Every structure is written in structure tokens, then in C-alpha cells.
A protein has these predicted regions:
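Short, solvent-exposed loop/turn segments enriched in Ser/Thr/Gly
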Residues: 175-179
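Substrate-binding clefts and catalytic carboxylate motifs of secreted carbohydrate-active enzymes
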Residues: 1-173
């Protein structure tokens, strides 16, 4: 299976001011978005997989492009949010079940519904408490309950340093038309 737009690229866009295709599984640097792990879990069933994707507050975005509805659920791996808020998230897995832990407290165990194609390898967790930050751990288990994979995201601390270096090639133009 191949999907032309699986990686973001410069060129075709969805109206100004967008300069490229961004409804993909990989960003321009080939860094995977959380949805890429859904594809990995489906096409590499022999390698146990679990990966957390936090639903962005902005939600989903879909576009009608060449008479095909495309788009993606805006997911990220960020666990820095407003204290006391709740977030929904997905775990992408090819394991039998996933247990979700927030700061060490179990949010429950859900089984991977492999009988329904639209739900296979995707487990949805609604209104997960953020609290005051900390960590979220997804533990994938086989049918016997043995751990086969694990993924963890955590709240980042305050930045300690930022370094910026100017990059000023002579052919760049600040006219709104340059891709840089």
C-alpha cells in the first residue's frame, strides 16, 4: 500500500497561506505524527506496538481535495496543559489490550477491537484528567496479560536556555512567497 501524501511536502496546498501538504503521517523532516504508529501497528503485527496521541484542543480538520475527503485528527505527544483540565487521547496498538496510567493511577484497561476495521488498533480514552501534570503511560498487553510494549509521555519542565542562530541566505525574500 502506498499513499502519496503520507509525508508532508512543499507544493500542493489547501489555499493561501499554506505552502504545502500537511495532512500526513510524517512531518517535513520525516518525524512521525502519532497516527504513523497506527500504520506501523497494522503493517508490522509481529512487532508489539503502543503509542499515545493526545487530541489537540483544535480538533479534527478535513478537506475535500480532488473529490476525496482527506484530513487528520490533530494529535500530538504534548502533556503540558492547563492544570485541572481533561484531555482525550488515543492509543495505537496491535496488542490485545492497553492499560492507561496517569501519574501511576490506572484509568482502566481497554481491549483492541480487531473485529471492526474502523476501530482496529485504535483505542480512544475520553476525558483523561490532566491534574497538575506528570506522566501518562500506555502499557500494551498480550492475551495472557503480559506486558509487550510501553509508551510514556510527560509534562515538560520550564525551559532553561534558548539559542537562536540567524540563517540569512542571499536568495531568500521576505515577500510572503518564499517557502522558507
Amino acid at each position: 500500500m502506498a499513499y502519496w501524501g503520507s509525508a508532508e511536502y512543499w507544493g500542493e496546498s489547501n489555499k493561501w497561506p499554506k505552502k504545502g501538504w500537511n495532512y500526513s503521517f510524517f512531518d517535513h523532516t520525516m518525524r512521525p505524527y502519532p497516527q504513523a504508529y497506527l500504520i506501523k501497528s497494522a503493517f508490522m503485527p509481529e512487532i508489539p506496538e503502543v503509542h499515545i496521541g493526545v487530541v489537540d484542543a483544535a480538533g479534527a480538520e478535513s478537506v475535500n481535495w480532488n473529490d476525496v475527503i482527506v484530513g487528520r485528527m490533530a494529535l500530538n505527544e504534548c502533556w503540558n496543559h492547563t492544570p485541572g483540565s481533561r484531555r482525550s487521547l488515543f492509543t495505537f496498538t496491535n496488542a490485545h489490550s492497553v492499560e492507561l496510567l496517569v501519574n501511576g493511577q490506572s484509568m482502566g484497561i481497554q481491549e483492541n477491537d480487531t473485529t471492526r476495521a474502523n476501530l482496529r488498533n485504535m483505542i480512544y480514552w475520553k476525558d483523561v484528567p490532566y491534574g497538575n501534570g506528570g506522566s501518562v503511560v500506555a502499557i500494551a498487553r498480550d492475551k495472557s496479560g503480559k506486558e509487550v510494549a510501553r509508551h510514556r509521555i510527560e509534562t515538560a519542565g520550564k525551559a532553561v536556555a534558548l539559542r537562536i542562530e540567524a540563517e540569512t541566505p542571499t536568495d531568500w525574500k521576505a515577500d510572503g512567497m518564499d517557502l522558507q
